[in-house]
Design a protein with these regions (language model features):
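Lipolytic serine-hydrolase domain surface
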Residues: 59-75, 85-93, 112-117, 123-138, ...
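Active-site catalytic motif of lipid deacylating hydrolases and related acyltransferases
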Residues: 56-196
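Proline/glycine-enriched tight loop/beta-turn segments at coil->beta junctions
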Residues: 49-53
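Serine-dependent carboxylesterase/thioesterase catalytic core
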Residues: 43, 169-311
Length: 423
């Protein structure tokens, strides 16, 4: 994407990304059985601190109860009823694997649905229901904090951020505004300035929230940013969300001046993010994308996933090819807002951020099989989570593994070695 992206959609290029990507195989580590693992984390903490990292934010949603594949929009379009599936063997079976009512992913207790609250009660509920599957648990964040900060004079602050999980354009745009407000809060609370860095690790569609935030951070995005902020302010006023209007009023002047972080730098790592929105790197420090990926293709294009029907319907139940949520939750898919006001505002945001709509366009985007966006570095990782089990709770179609406790050392090592220089 151009340096000044201005909310353009990613071009979803299938070209070889070359030196932008590396390939790794995971080595799980259980800290309770490995003092050397704790020592390694402490060394990584020193390297992070040396490079100015003062805050690490662990941003996530919930795989449960949120239409993680975004089939509501595809069903609303009625692709199967309108004959788009004629001649495409296995398409109805694929949609059944993606659909909430038939994919085996449980609902949240009490029918809890997005927007999810970023509060202790909801976080505890997720920890109880889904554990460390696509979820940065309190245990994970606390262990990260303790292990990184051993021996540091200035501790690195570790923060857990649960986004609303509204898997549509409006929800992600509102979450981007909230996140920018929080970034400002943290910059002030921890007295960050020139030379300091905030590192955000974003799982799944939380990465798309950060992609929108990167466009809002760009000093050059004036007209589109104003248009989007005005749209969101009007919607927030309509539904009595004064927190959104207040945040926009507070951050808009700072965004225009490039002063939101008070001179600090924002680094972003995405974990299993579907490729949709384009990134604007001009307001970021570093950008890295990590994807659970196993090479199944026969054409030598090792950097692409495999999306062949009907074969995918046999590969997906055991997560054979890696992360299928990352692969399939692309343009055209989405949850659907529940109110008329939400639907109208979502359509207006849609027109700014994503030119694709329609069942056939979704299928076209999915078949592009792109693992990485056009901006940033990438790591393709075989996380070894395909064991032959068809129990979705074991792998959640390859989307759960990034936040597992036994992956903390591996992920942190890869992130630090890729983004931050040795002392």
């Amino acid at each position: 994407m151009p340096v000044e992206n201005n909310f353009q959609h990613d071009e979803m290029s299938r070209k070889n990304p070359g030196e932008r990507i590396t390939v790794r195989e995971v080595t799980p580590t259980v800290f309770s059985e490995s003092s050397s693992g704790l020592d390694s984390m402490a060394a990584l903490g020193k390297r992070l601190s040396h490079n100015g990292v003062r805050v690490i934010v662990f941003m996530h949603g919930s795989i449960m109860g949120t239409d993680v594949f975004g089939v509501q929009r595809l069903d609303e379009l009625g692709g199967l009823k309108r004959g788009y599936s004629r001649g495409v063997a296995g398409l109805d079976a694929l949609l059944a694997l993606m659909r909430e009512s038939s994919n085996g992913i449980a609902s949240l207790p009490g029918g809890l649905k997005p927007p999810l609250m970023n509060d202790d009660a909801t976080k505890r509920l997720l920890d109880e229901q889904i554990g460390d599957a696509g979820n940065f648990t309190n245990t994970y964040v606390e262990l990260m904090k303790q292990s990184l900060n051993r021996g540091l004079d200035r501790p690195i602050h570790c923060i857990r951020e649960l986004w609303s999980c509204e898997h549509h354009h409006l929800g992600r745009a509102l979450a981007a505004i909230s996140m920018l407000g929080h970034l400002r809060d943290w910059s002030e609370a921890y007295r960050l300035g020139q030379g300091d860095r905030i590192l955000v690790q974003a799982h799944g569609q939380a990465g798309l929230v950060l992609a929108l935030a990167s466009n809002l951070l760009s000093v050059a995005s004036t007209s589109s940013r104003t248009r989007l902020c005005d749209l969101l302010s009007a919607y927030a006023s309509e539904i009595d969300r004064s927190d959104i209007t207040t945040t926009i009023q507070r951050i808009a002047p700072l965004l225009s001046k490039g002063a939101l972080l008070n001179g600090a730098t924002l680094d972003v790592v995405t974990l299993g993010m579907p490729v949709r929105y384009g990134w604007d790197p001009s307001g970021l420090g570093t950008l890295l994308h990590i994807v659970n990926h196993r090479y199944l293709r026969t054409d030598g294009k090792t950097w692409l996933s495999k999306m062949e029907l009907p074969q995918i319907t046999m590969e997906m139940p055991i997560a054979w090819g890696g992360d299928y949520v990352q692969e399939l939750a692309v343009a055209g898919s989405d949850a659907v807002p529940t109110t008329d006001a939400g639907k109208a505002a979502n359509k207006a945001v849609w027109e700014i951020v994503e030119p694709f709509d329609g069942f056939e366009r979704w299928l076209e985007c999915a078949r592009r099989a792109v693992r990485f966006p056009s901006e940033g570095l990438g790591i393709l990782v075989d996380y070894k989570d395909s064991t032959g089990s068809t129990n979705v709770r074991d792998h959640y179609f390859g989307h759960a593994v990034y936040t597992r406790l036994n992956m903390m050392l591996f992920n942190t090592t890869e992130i630090v070695q890729t983004l931050y220089q040795s002392p």
